[in-house]
Amino acid sequence: MKIISTILLCCTISIYVQAQNNLDKVFDSTAVTHTKVRDTYKSTRIVQGQSSEMLRKHELDFRVAHRFGDAAGEFGGTKTFFGTDNSTDIRIAFEYGISDNLMVGISRSKGSGDLQQLYEGLVKYRLLQQTTDNLVPVSLALFGNMVISGMPSGTDITSAAYFADGSDRMMYVTQAIISKKFADKLSLTLVPSYVHRNHVAYMDMNNMFALGAAGRLKLSKRLGLLAEYYYPFRTRESKDYFKSQKGITFYNPLGLGLEIETGGHVFSITFTNSTAILENQFIPETTSTWLQGQFRWGFNISRRFTLFGKKDWKK
């Protein structure tokens, strides 16, 4: 009898232990981890505008962007080798990740339009990062920059290039960047934007709101197709004045791109109707249209370096 009791007791203990182990596994498997979504985009920029992606802490990003002349139309074609003989804008930038959610940068651009020789300071802060369980359904980043022109002042007081004082040289952009990655193939973004220019041409707008939309379609591990569109809310009065008095028609910026990732490099081939690179200019000042062949190809190159890593801190 004692032997039977002992056997039953051992079996009971064994069953209890096994049941407890299985229960622990169930609770562990149902625990919410809130894993953050990575690589909504491969770069901090999409075609022209900002993405919600950030540089990692202590990461330095050296960026070069170039836009050529019209690929087709009156000023393109074979006579300019499809725009490669000309350059509408060039930008060189250094951007740095202070933390995983905060980055700053400086840049110098050729500029396009009335204002040229542009120096930029920028900051971007990520408030939210999407999680795989949709506890946080979207990523949200705030972007702002300040740009100042270093060119000599013009003499026409009705021109944007006439500077009565130093503040007339300055312009600003503020954006909220809202992104969502769907599965592993598709990323979409909305970008409510505000552009302020201290001094503008007669009948132009100092303050302008715009709404941007962009997306990325993953083609392979290293290839992605990009698209980007901005709708500036320019007043009808301003549009009519520039069209009737100066023969200038404003168009909405539309860009397409092919993104290639190779190790620490991200290389993008772009096609866009805007001549400028900075948001301060391409949002309010695009006067070229795809329908007349006034689009240009260009490229963005990003090369990242890690500074002050863990090994450096230990030293």
Residue ranges and their predicted role:
Residues 16, 190-236:
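A mid-sequence, solvent-exposed acidic-amphipathic segment
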Residues 1-23:
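Bacterial Sec-dependent N-terminal signal peptides
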Residues 20-152, 157-163, 170-174, 179-190, ...:
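Transmembrane beta-barrel domains of Gram-negative outer membranes and organellar outer membranes
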